[in-house]
Structures are given as structure tokens and as C-alpha cells.
Amino acid sequence: MMNTGAIIQDLIDWIDNHLDSRLDIDTVARRAGYSKWHLQRIFKEHTGQPLGEYIRAQKLQKSIERLAHSNEPILNVAIALGFDSQQSFNRSFKRQYGQAPGVW
């Protein structure tokens, strides 16, 4: 049986490989086989970061790569990475990086 640290690392790898999917805490918890409450607790214990924050940060990092290396419209990037709207993407992006995604 895998220890909790190995399970979390496996989950991080899975998340990082599925950033183009609609990822939410419920989906990740089902994948891990834990309740979402338990998963959030052990994820934070092992990484120091809340699970939702980790997913959002990884998606935003991927959005920078896509925006910097293509002419893809911001809306397309936002939707492809699972944001509900360009507005919600813009808010998250600005909160994370202090500037609008159009700068990239």
C-alpha cells in the first residue's frame, strides 16, 4: 500500500497531466478515493498549499505558456483550462500575477 506522501505525489502528477480537463476538488477526490474534506486536509499537510489553490495556480501557469507562445484568444485559453468565463479567468489571473492576461 502506498504511503500518503506517495499518494499525494501521484495525485499531483495526475493533476498536472489533466490541466486541460475540468478539474475540481470533487473530481480529484474521486480520483484519489478520499472524501474531499480528507483529501484537502492531507494535501495541505503534505504540500503546505490548499488543493484548490494548487489546481488554480497550475492552470494559471499553463495559461501563461499558452498566451505567451500562441495567438490564441484569451477566452479560448480560459475555457480550455476549465474556467467558467473569461471574467473569472481574468480575476484569478490578476489576483495571482498582479496584471491582466492580455499583457502576456
Give, region by region, the residue ranges found by the protein language model.
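The short coil/loop that forms the "turn" connecting the two helices of the helix-turn-helix
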Residues: 34, 83-84
